[in-house]
Regions:
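The DNA-recognition helices of helix-turn-helix-type DNA-binding domains
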Residues: 33
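Short, charged recognition helix plus adjacent turn
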Residues: 3-4, 8, 13, 17, ...
Length: 65
């Protein structure tokens, strides 16, 4: 899912800029294949629901609760 989101934004740098994080933070999400829930919510809002937070978090939901 994170790869689709990055493609939508055009680059890791642009995604990071939109979220107010570093590109290295985004790179870590790619490496871990996990996005923190609060960032997933932010992505859902920024993309007007194009990507749903619940789908971004996926099977890791219980881990974050």
């Amino acid at each position: 899912m994170i790869h689709k989101i990055i493609r939508w934004f055009g680059s890791q740098v642009e995604l990071a800029r939109q979220l107010g994080v570093t590109q290295s933070a985004v790179a870590q999400w790619v490496a871990d294949e996990k996005v923190p829930p609060y960032r997933a919510i932010q992505i859902e809002r920024i993309t007007d629901g194009q990507f749903k937070a619940v789908d971004i978090i996926g099977d890791d939901q219980d881990e974050w609760l």
